[in-house]
Amino acid sequence: MFESKINPLWQSFILAVQEEVKPALGCTEPISLALAAAAAAAELDGTVERIDAWVSPNLMKNGMGVTVPGTGMVGLPIAAALGVLGGDAKAGLEVLKDASAKAVADAKAMLAAGHVAVMLQEPCNDILFSRAKVYSGDSWACVTIVGDHTNIVRIETDKGVVFTQADNAQEEEKTSPLGVLSHTSLEEILAFVNAVPFDAIRFILDAARLNGALSQEGLRGSWGLHIGSTLAKQCDRGLLAKDLSTAILIRTSAASDARMGGATLPAMSNSGSGNQGITATVPVMVVAEHVGADDERLARALMLSHLSAIYIHHQLPRLSALCAATTAAMGAAAGMAWLIDGRYDTIAMAISSMIGDVSGMICDGASNSCAMKVSTSASAAWKALLMALDDTAVTGNEGIVAHNVEQSIANLCSLACRSMQQTDKQIIEIMASKAH
């Protein structure tokens, strides 16, 4: 068995990827509220008549403008209503995967009747917080999710507390497979990818299957801003070259178009985000096809991409003012570099150049325009790699880029953790003023 060849560090890497790379149907912030609502509804015997919900400012930001799959509607209220009326509380981030047309119609009717209210949780010290309280006659149930999109910390009904999660976050961090990322390095991740038995990481090929299907759907339909299909038309008109760079741009954009436009296909997410999963997957797939990589080489490249993206994102808040498509694309740069020459120095140079390029991109909420940022990040990854292949990169003498890639990553993440907190507040204020 391959388990005997895997040391504890490598096993932690595999578990970290399995924990952070999961199928998700729909943008994960509204889906988190849908899950809370579905879990609350599951505690009641009668038909839910009314929903009150509270979310953190960051979750509100990422839920205001994004389409909920299968509904043609944007926002948190429809997500909460559909979670109650058609959600499967046991399905995690795929809570809405089996929602029927009748459930969608009933959810829209509940909204039209004014029976769904979504409010800001104030005060709120949690970046990711969603709470749904549902009512049926004199009975009610309330579910709270904190810290992670599926992390239910409390279930309560009118009869009393059903479940509460012990407050042992620090101990869990020590034992979590993600905890090992705080004291590892990109070099150790690369060594793992080069030597781990293929059978131990074969599962990552599911990312190519799911996100590849989303890309194809994005090119077929008119989803979201339809960036991918629009750019494909411009190729046919002779305004854009049909080359590898354009293929990366078009196919990655198309997957995000479908994702944000409400296609009823799951994305393989990364760090709680479908767009991050798409960004870490599709560029690597395109380059793998170009170089004729077999399944094993594709799996190793995808594992490097996804694990590098997780490694960087682990140094960030779960949600922040920094667009994390940029950090996911740093993972993609690593995966593409591995396919082309496999050298650590190439990977490090590509990531450093990306930090010198797209590090200022803000997250102004989940919406169709996320596909623009995904496409920009994917293109930046390819550009940075082309430079690195010629031993050219942004150096430690420039901006926030340091003389080694690990410090460059730390510098970028420190901006998001500290300085960009005020940026985040300003973004939320601007978006809230538009909603009134």
UniProtKB/Swiss-Prot annotation:
Molecular function (GO) terms listed? Answer: L-cysteine desulfhydrase activity
Please give the biological process terms from Gene Ontology that the record holds.
L-cysteine catabolic process to pyruvate
* Matches recorded under Pfam families: SDH_alpha (PF03313)
Q: Which domain of life is it from?
A: Bacteria
Name the residues that span the membrane: none
PANTHER family linked to this entry:
UPF0597 PROTEIN YHAM
Sequence similarity: Belongs to the UPF0597 family.
Instruction: Please give the name of this protein.
Output: UPF0597 protein YhaM
